[in-house]
């Protein structure tokens, strides 16, 4: 592989998540989203919650997830769940690349995940479902505002 190909392989996304709601777009930290798109450059790609929320003196306040030393992050993407009722678990789901295609794995989240409206996991049980180009991912309950579309096949991911 030449240097240019190596650079492109490292920098270009293998897939993306497209934010489908304003709430989903606002949940993504600055620097992780561009034009409503989140780049996925490696698999598994792990997603979870960045912060907790609480009502203090009648106002919603967010407390950040503590970081301990040089510990490796639990997620590749930390979403900010701004609602008073949390939809997103700290370690919610991951996207895997397999020989057969892509797989969404719920990592034992409390509220579960949906793939095109089909419930995966929830009640801390975990679960998995095939994930195809164009599928919609809902993070949390049926009424979650955190919805994304999975777009695959951008470059080869050495499956």
Predicted regions, residues:
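C-terminal boundary/linker segments immediately following FHA domains
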Residues: 47, 94-103, 108-110, 114-159
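Short, surface-exposed charged micro-motifs
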Residues: 37, 92-94
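A structural connector/turn signal
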Residues: 82-83, 90, 125-126
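Intrinsically disordered, low-complexity acidic Ser/Thr-rich regulatory segments
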Residues: 1-86, 135-136, 145-159
């Amino acid at each position: 592989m030449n240097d240019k190909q190596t650079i492109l392989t490292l920098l270009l996304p293998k897939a993306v998540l497209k934010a489908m709601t304003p709430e989903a777009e606002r949940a993504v930290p600055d620097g992780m989203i561009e034009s409503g798109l989140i780049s996925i450059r490696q698999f598994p790609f792990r997603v979870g919650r960045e912060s907790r929320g609480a009502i203090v003196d009648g106002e919603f306040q967010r407390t950040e997830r503590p970081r301990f030393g040089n510990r490796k992050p639990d997620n590749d993407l930390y979403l900010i769940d701004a609602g008073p009722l949390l939809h997103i678990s700290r370690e919610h789901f991951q996207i895997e690349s397999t020989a057969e295609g892509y797989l969404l794995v719920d990592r034992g989240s409390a509220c579960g995940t949906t793939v095109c409206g089909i419930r995966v996991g929830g009640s801390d049980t975990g679960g998995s479902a095939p994930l195809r180009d164009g599928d919609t991912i809902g993070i949390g309950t049926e009424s979650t505002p955190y919805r994304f579309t999975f777009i695959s096949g951008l470059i080869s991911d050495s499956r």
